[in-house]
């Protein structure tokens, strides 16, 4: 049985429709990240599920029961919103303990649970401090601890790592999934950070303009985005999109890039004779100086070393800028200048230029 089920959920404000007929089913114990650009409706969705806002249409089912009209306090949800909403006159300890106190937990139980979640979120040293003495990151983690301390069956987290410094944010990306799974809660986790969504979610629901564009595992979304809109949201540098007009031949589809004929393999014939966008992730491009190895000519404009890889900014003969991301010693010595870029057709994506929809085979 799904712990959270949304059916045709819609919400509009005076400025226009924010959510448009959302359907989503989240299984017990699953972590689903709601990911999308700013203004997509992510926080509004959490507020509807929490009961803070009312939907204009559709239904919300929690643990198999229709909770669309249920009062917030009767939904059994742990919540951590972006604005923290901490009690200003209470210590971090008492803020975290507030839900446990409301449920009549013993003093020993309260201390044990608060100490446990505070240690996991690295805020044990500030438990005696009031919110005014906490940094934004500490406030955010205190709100997160409060959401988890009472062991709710459903947890809603609204960008809980947004105000956390870079080092701790990286650590929490690694630790949060284990923490959330240990709580046995079903989690909806809102974020604008695609890396965070991929690291934490069992699945990702990509919300664009009030609609779920794609709901799938992180790997599926990265390798097989259903549209240009989804593809652009994942990856840094982002996906290269090269306008092409593929033609069918004896060896399958081919196209012209930067004045060179490039094979697309036998699996992409659906795009023949149409204006398409060839989608190439930067890491799928191999750059070399030897024309005999195949590929299409480019000019390497800039080389940026980044840890153990280099990011190459290149320009085709048509003037389009594309990126390649490569690891290896040879890239440390690469200089700007003429080169050739090639790719494995099996890793290429094809999008209809007019609709943006992905067509044909997907990696």
Segments the model singles out, each with a brief description of its role:
Residues 72, 76-78, 82, 86-229:
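ABC ATPase nucleotide-binding domains
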């Amino acid at each position: 049985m799904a712990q959270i089920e949304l059916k045709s959920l819609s919400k509009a404000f005076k400025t226009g429709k924010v959510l448009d007929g959302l359907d989503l089913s989240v299984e017990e114990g699953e972590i689903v990240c709601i990911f999308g650009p700013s203004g997509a409706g992510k926080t509004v969705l959490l507020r509807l599920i929490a009961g803070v806002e009312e939907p204009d249409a559709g239904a919300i089912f929690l643990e198999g029961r229709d909770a669309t009209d249920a009062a917030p306090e009767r939904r059994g949800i742990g919540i951590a919103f972006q604005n923290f909403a901490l009690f200003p006159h209470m210590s971090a300890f008492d803020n975290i303990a507030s839900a446990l106190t409301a449920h009549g937990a013993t003093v020993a139980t309260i201390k044990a649970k608060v100490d446990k979640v505070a240690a996991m979120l690295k805020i044990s040293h500030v438990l005696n401090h009031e919110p005014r003495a906490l940094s934004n990151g500490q406030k955010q983690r205190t709100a997160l601890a409060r959401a988890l301390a009472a062991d709710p069956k459903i947890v809603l987290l609204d960008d809980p790592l947004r105000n956390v410094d870079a080092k701790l944010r990286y650590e929490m990306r690694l630790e949060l999934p284990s923490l959330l799974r240990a709580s046995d809660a079903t989690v909806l986790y809102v974020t604008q950070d695609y890396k965070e969504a991929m690291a934490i979610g069992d699945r990702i629901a990509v919300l664009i303009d009030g609609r779920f564009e794609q709901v799938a595992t992180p790997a599926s979304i990265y390798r097989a985005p259903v549209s240009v809109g989804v593809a652009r949201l994942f990856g840094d540098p982002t996906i290269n999109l090269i306008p092409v007009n593929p033609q069918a031949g004896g060896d399958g589809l081919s196209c012209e890039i930067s004045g060179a004929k490039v094979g697309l393999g036998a699996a992409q014939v659906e795009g023949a004779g149409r204006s398409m966008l060839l989608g190439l992730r930067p890491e799928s491009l191999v750059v070399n100086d030897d024309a005999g190895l195949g590929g299409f000519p480019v000019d390497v404009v800039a080389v940026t070393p980044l840890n153990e890889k280099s990011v190459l900014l290149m320009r085709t003969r048509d003037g389009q800028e594309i990126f390649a991301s490569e690891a290896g010693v040879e890239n440390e010595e690469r200089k700007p200048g003429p080169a050739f870029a090639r790719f494995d057709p099996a890793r290429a994506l094809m999008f209809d230029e007019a609709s943006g929809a992905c067509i044909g085979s997907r990696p």
